[in-house]
Amino acid sequence: MAAGSRIDLTNQFLIAMPGMADDTFAGTVVYLCEHSERGALGLVINKPIDIKLKNLFEKVELSLDRAELAEQPVFFGGPVQTERGFVLHEKQGEGESPYTSTMSVPGGLEMTTSKDVLEAMSSGAGPRRVLVTLGCSGWSAGQLEDEIGRNGWLTVGADPTVIFDTPVPQRYQRAVSLLGFDPRMLSNEAGHA
């Protein structure tokens, strides 16, 4: 890569290598919502916590009558802003009201941090396919690139079916398989030719 050039990893999965030194991210798949010269922001998609969506809605004094969502787990999105909710969802349809605080991610997903998305879901509207996290993952300028350079992460284009349709215990393996090889072939040893 030429000096001064950079790769945009927005709408990519970060897949933790088996030798990941940081226990917080060991075994994780992170969906990158934003990656720029200022840093990166993502959500861990395969670490559920012991809270169901219906319980989270109760905590914010909303009801959730959508059976397909009520028992869905809330996820640990990362160690940053752990008291804040992040809702990863498919892009809103035509004619739907926009939410107060939504980031559009190239590739068709959106991340919303305002309570109005929960209110829409509570009323039976809102996004149909969601992943809700408490906290997010953040990297300062150059930090993620450094971790990738030290063989901490693999990257691959994100596939929404891994986020929304793949059972949680299979998400890591499924994300690795997007690279075209068996996850059992990963080693925690890195080499350079």
PLM feature segments, named:
Residues M1-T133, S137-A193:
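A short aromatic-anchored loop/beta-hairpin motif
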